[in-house]
UniProtKB/Swiss-Prot annotation:
Single GO BP term: proteolysis
Free-text comment on the cofactor: Binds 1 zinc ion per subunit.
Database matches in Pfam families: Disintegrin (PF00200), Pep_M12B_propep (PF01562), Reprolysin (PF01421)
PTM remark: The N-terminus is blocked.
Keywords on record: Calcium, Cell adhesion impairing toxin, Disulfide bond, Fibrinogenolytic toxin, Hemostasis impairing toxin, Hydrolase, Metal-binding, Metalloprotease, Platelet aggregation inhibiting toxin, Protease, Pyrrolidone carboxylic acid, Secreted, Signal, Toxin, Zinc, Zymogen
Propeptide span(s): 21-191
Subcellular location, record wording: Secreted
Domain of life according to the entry: Eukaryota
A molecular function GO annotation: toxin activity
Sequence motif Cell attachment site, residues: 462-464
Protein name per its UniProtKB record: Zinc metalloproteinase-disintegrin jerdonitin
Record's miscellaneous remark: Negative results: does not show hemorrhagic activities after intradermal injection in mice. Does not show pro-coagulant and anti-coagulant activities. The disintegrin domain belongs to the long disintegrin subfamily.
Predominant localisation class: secreted
Length: 484
C-alpha cells in the first residue's frame, strides 16, 4: 500500500496588498502577498520524495481560511513519453526524459464541491484554483532570498488587447430543437474511460520566441497539458501527453498568416511524418504566428482518429499557459465534434470552453449545450471515438495508483473520483472496488453493473468493416477477429 504523505503549508498573508507588480503572468494591478511555509508529517524512517504524491495547503483568501488539497497528476505522461528536437542540419534528436517524479498537480478546495485547482510546484507554487465560483492565481514573486508569492484574480491582470479573438472554425454553432436540461441534470453515462494520446508540437516561431530555451518550452507545455487534462477529466476523457516536438531548426510544415493553410499543412505533415514514428491519437501545433482576422486557433471538425485531420493549431501566449490550455481544449473539442455555443448556452461562468468568441478570461467548464451534445451524440459516434478506447496499459501510466483520481490503475476495479463526487453505483469510491453484486462499473459492454449479453453490438461498423460485439464475460468491447 502506498504511504500517503500529508504536507501542510501555511500561507501567511503579508500585511499589505500590492498595488502593481510585473509577474510572469504580466502586469498585475492588485494582489495579496503570501509566504508558503511547509510542514511535513512523515512516518519515522520514511524517505521524502522530491514532489510528494499528496499535499495540503492551508491559507486565507480575503481573510477567509481555505484548505487546498492537491494530488499529483499521475496520468499526465505515458510511459513511452518522448521529446524530439532537431540539430542545426535538421537531424532528428529524440530523448525519453524521466517524468515519474514530476511536479504537476490537480486539486480541490475543502468543503467546496464545485472547486478545482491546477498547480505546478516545480519552483514555488504556480497555477490557479477556483474558490466559491471565482478563479484565483498564485505565482512566486521571485524576489531575492524570499519565498513570497502573489495571489490575484485574473481581472487584475493587465490585458494586452481587449479586442475579441475568434476561433477559425465557422458554421458550427449549436442548434437543437430539444430543450436543454440544467447542468446539474446532465449526466455523463458511466461508459468506458476514453483516452486521447496527445502530441504537442512547438513550431520554430515559438522556439525562437523563447530564445531556444528547451527547458522553458517544455515546462510551458507540461503546464498547458496539466490544465488540459484537468478540463477533460470531467468528461471521463483522459488526455495523456505521449510526446513533445520542438521545431528547433526550422518549420517542418507551412506556417503562414492563413490559419486554414497552416492547419492543412500541419495535418499533411502529421500523416506523412509524425504518425510514421510516434503512435498517438491527436496532435496540436503551438505557434508563434499571429494569424489574420484575429484567429487564435483552428481545427478540423469531427476528425478525431483521422490520420490527417486529427489535428489543431493554437496561438501561443508566453505569459498565459492557462489561456493556451483553454484554447487547445476548444480546438480539441472541435476534433471530437463539439459545436460552438449559441447565445442560450451556459456553464455557470462568464466564459465556456466552446464559446465562439475567445475570451481572455480562463474557463474550465463546458456549457450545458456541450454536455448535452457529448452525452447524446459524441459519446456514441464510432467514427470519432474508435481510437480512444485503446487505453494505455495500466502500467503505461507512470507512478503508483491512487484511489479517487478518476483513472483506473493497477490494483483497482474502478475509479469514479472522490466519494463526494462519485455518481457510479457500481463502484465503491472509498476503495475503488466494485460494489457487492456488481460485475463491472463502466465499459461499452457494462449495463447497470452487469456484463451485457453475448452478441450485443457494442461498436457499429464503419464503411465496409464489421460490427464489434460483447462477449458476455467482460465490460470492454472486444475487437471483431474478422476485421479486415
Amino acid at each position: 500500500m502506498i504511504q500517503v504523505l500529508l504536507v501542510t503549508i501555511c500561507l501567511a498573508v503579508f500585511p499589505y496588498q500590492g498595488s502593481s507588480i510585473i509577474l510572469e503572468s504580466g502586469n498585475i494591478d492588485d494582489y495579496e502577498v503570501v509566504y508558503p511555509r511547509k510542514v511535513t508529517a512523515l512516518p519515522k524512517g520514511a524517505v521524502q520524495q522530491k514532489y510528494e504524491d499528496t499535499m495540503q495547503y492551508e491559507f486565507k483568501v480575503n481573510e477567509e481560511p481555505v484548505v487546498l488539497h492537491l494530488e499529483k497528476n499521475k496520468g499526465l505522461f505515458s510511459k513511452d513519453y518522448s521529446e524530439t528536437h532537431y540539430s542545426p542540419d535538421g537531424r532528428e534528436i529524440t530523448t525519453y526524459p524521466p517524468v515519474e517524479d514530476h511536479c504537476y498537480y490537480h486539486g480541490r478546495i475543502q468543503n467546496d464541491a464545485d472547486s478545482t485547482a491546477s498547480i505546478s510546484a516545480c519552483n514555488g507554487l504556480k497555477g490557479h484554483f477556483k474558490l466559491q465560483g471565482e478563479t484565483y492565481f498564485i505565482e512566486p514573486l521571485k524576489l531575492p532570498d524570499s519565498e513570497a508569492h502573489a495571489v490575484f484574480k485574473y481581472e487584475n491582470v493587465e490585458k494586452e488587447d481587449e479586442a475579441p479573438k475568434m476561433c477559425g472554425v465557422t458554421e458550427t454553432n449549436w442548434e437543437s430543437d430539444e430543450p436543454i436540461k440544467k447542468l446539474s441534470q446532465i449526466m455523463i453515462p458511466p461508459e468506458q474511460q476514453r483516452y486521447i494520446e496527445l502530441v504537442i508540437v512547438a513550431d520554430h516561431r515559438m522556439y525562437t520566441k523563447y530564445d531556444g530555451d528547451k527547458t522553458e518550452i517544455s515546462s510551458k507545455i507540461y503546464e498547458t497539458a496539466n490544465n488540459l487534462n484537468e478540463i477533460y477529466r470531467h468528461l471521463k476523457i483522459h488526455v495523456v501527453l505521449i510526446g513533445l516536438e520542438m521545431w528547433s531548426s526550422g518549420e517542418l510544415s507551412k506556417v503562414t498568416l492563413s490559419a486554414d493553410e497552416t492547419l492543412d499543412s500541419f495535418g499533411e505533415w502529421r500523416e506523412r511524418d509524425l504518425l510514421q514514428r510516434k503512435r498517438h491519437d491527436n496532435a496540436q501545433l503551438l505557434t508563434g504566428m499571429i494569424f489574420n482576422e484575429k484567429i487564435e486557433g483552428r481545427a478540423y471538425k469531427e476528425s478525431m482518429c483521422d490520420p490527417k485531420r486529427s489535428v489543431g493549431i493554437v496561438r501561443d501566449h508566453r505569459t498565459r499557459p492557462h489561456l493556451v490550455a483553454n484554447r487547445m481544449a476548444h480546438e480539441l473539442g472541435h476534433n471530437l465534434g463539439f459545436h460552438h455555443d449559441g447565445d442560450s448556452c451556459t456553464c455557470g461562468a462568464n466564459s465556456c470552453i466552446m464559446s465562439a468568441t475567445v475570451s481572455n478570461e480562463p474557463s474550465s467548464r463546458f456549457s450545458d449545450c456541450s454536455l448535452f451534445q457529448y452525452s447524446s451524440d459524441i459519446i456514441h459516434n464510432p467514427f470519432t471515438s474508435r481510437c480512444l478506447y485503446n487505453e494505455p496499459s495500466k502500467t503505461d501510466i507512470v507512478s503508483p495508483s491512487v484511489c479517487g483520481n478518476y483513472y483506473m490503475e493497477v490494483g483497482e476495479d474502478c475509479d469514479c473520483g472522490p466519494p463526494a463526487n462519485c455518481q457510479n453505483p457500481c463502484c465503491d469510491a472509498a476503495t475503488c472496488r466494485l460494489t457487492p453484486g456488481s460485475q463491472c462499473a463502466d465499459g461499452l459492454c457494462c449495463d447497470q453493473c452487469r456484463f451485457m449479453k453475448k452478441g450485443t453490438i457494442c461498436r457499429i461498423a464503419r464503411g465496409d468493416d464489421l460490427d464489434d460485439y460483447c462477449n458476455g464475460i467482460s465490460a470492454g468491447c472486444p475487437r471483431n477477429p474478422f476485421h479486415a
